[in-house]
């Protein structure tokens, strides 16, 4: 699978997971309608389905996906919650993405 396709799929997967977790947060912590649980459940189902589209071992997918998830979570924090990430947050994202690149580019045994 081409790298840009994989990264795009990871980004979509992260958004689906974040939305699926953010909507119940709005209900539980911010007093929004319990009806938000319906789109949250659908979003988490899409998240699980998207994970199946990756062509490598699931453990490796989850590990590599984690780097993109951390990046998307910080972007969500900034865009949706209006909290600007600190320099150390971005440094952490860089470390996560470096780890993701190492996992994705590393040799495959068996």
UniProtKB/Swiss-Prot annotation:
The keyword Membrane applies. It is a multi-pass membrane protein. One of its GO terms (cellular component) is plasma membrane. Belongs to the UPF0060 family. InterPro entries: UPF0060 (IPR003844). Pfam families: UPF0060. It is found in: Cell inner membrane. SUPFAM superfamilies: Multidrug resistance efflux transporter EmrE (SSF103481). Keywords: Cell inner membrane, Cell membrane, Membrane, Transmembrane, Transmembrane helix. The chain crosses the membrane at residues 7-27, 33-53, 63-83, 86-106. Its main location: membrane. This is UPF0060 membrane protein Bpet0062. It comes from the Bacteria.
